[in-house]
Design a protein with these regions (language model features):
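Structural motif
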Residues: 3-5, 23-26, 46-48, 66-69, ...
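Residues that scaffold, gate, or flank divalent-cation-dependent active/transport sites
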Residues: 6-15, 19, 34-45, 55-61, ...
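N-terminal glycine-rich anion-binding loops that anchor highly charged ligand groups
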Residues: 23-37
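Short His-Asn-centered micro-motif
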Residues: 28-30, 51, 109-111
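Long, charged alpha-helical interface segments
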Residues: 80-106, 110-116, 120-126, 163-181, ...
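Short, structured patches in soluble enzyme cores that scaffold and shape functional sites
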Residues: 109-113, 131-132, 152-156
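Glycine- and Gly-Pro-enriched alpha-helical subdomains that act as flexible
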Residues: 133, 137, 141-146, 159-177
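Intrinsic disorder/low-complexity segments
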Residues: 179-226
Length: 294
């Protein structure tokens, strides 16, 4: 098993040209797209469809009036002045997406970097959306199916590296490469990590035909030592240094500083850095929608 990492959005065009047919790509946009995606799914949404542009989201609404529109620009929910008359139902704060609002719904969410990263992976066997919130579940899935190649994809911020994405990729790389942790993943034991606020929640038993996923994918495989690229080692080293004061480290980064400066979004940073709150796999389907898969 070979593990590589894309740490900067500048690398995404090259990723899109790679042969990924035997690869699983894991996309991180911790603040906040992929954290919101897994929260939405945990709270009972049917699916979430990521798009890049406001116009794409509005086109979905015209075809399906019952969908919810989610998204932000500069951290703030999209309003009628930006769309020509339509207020979006939700922003990009995972705390907005309560069960009461999203259960049974399909959400179309406009997010620039997150969508760009997901689309760069469309040639992959499987594309997963991951965050700190569902990190161990994602690692357990990868260890079970033992793909030939894993690519950890950091969405970044605009054209820049995002500290929180690199740290999440490093944490997942550590889970997959550390033999003690890997053995625990193989047998389904909990993986030790810094304290968090909530206990694990059982996986929702659904399957929606995502990229390369099937029920037999969870057969237990022998744990083998993966081969790591330099970029994965870089992310692992960053994670090891930051993991015991994660909030403090991330709060100094660009994305977090922007959110912390907006009173109603201040708490999103700590929310998105909690580990293993949701025990689910979020997979991108061939139809462009992200759903829970087993």
């Amino acid at each position: 098993m070979k593990i590589d990492a894309i740490l900067s959005p500048a690398e995404l065009p090259a990723l899109a040209k790679r042969d990924l047919r035997n690869a699983i790509c894991v996309v991180f946009d911790v603040l906040r797209a992929t954290s919101t995606f897994v929260t939405v799914l945990h709270h009972g949404a049917k699916a979430i469809v990521p798009v890049s542009e406001i116009a794409e989201a509005l086109a979905f609404r015209q075809k399906q009036p019952d969908i919810l529109l989610g998204g932000e620009r500069d951290g703030v929910r999209i309003r009628a002045a930006q769309t020509g008359g339509v207020d979006f139902d939700l922003g990009n704060s995972p705390r907005e997406y309560t069960p009461e609002k999203v259960r049974g719904k399909t959400i179309v969410s406009t997010t620039t970097n997150g969508t760009r990263a997901l689309r760069a992976c469309t040639g992959a066997q499987t594309v997963l959306a991951a965050s700190f919130l569902n990190l161990t579940a994602t690692a357990q899935f990868l260890r079970r199916i033992q793909p030939a190649q894993i690519v950890l994809v950091c969405a970044g911020t605009r054209e820049n590296v995002a500290t929180e994405d690199v740290l999440a990729a490093g944490a997942l790389g550590e889970m997959l490469a550390n033999e003690t942790i890997a053995q625990n993943l193989k047998v389904g034991r909990a993986v030790p990590c810094p304290p968090r606020d909530e206990a694990n929640i059982p996986v929702q038993q659904q399957s929606h035909g995502a990229h390369g996923l099937s029920r037999h994918s969870h057969a237990t495989a022998e744990v083998s030592r993966p081969t790591l690229s330099d970029s994965v080692e870089t992310a692992r080293n960053a994670w090891r240094k930051a993991k015991f004061n994660l909030l403090e480290v991330v709060s100094e980064a660009e994305n977090a500083r922007r959110l912390l400066a907006i009173p109603e979004l201040h708490d999103d940073v700590a929310f998105c850095l909690r580990q293993d709150v949701y025990n689910l796999i979020a997979a991108l389907g061939r139809d462009g929608a992200i759903r829970i898969s087993i």
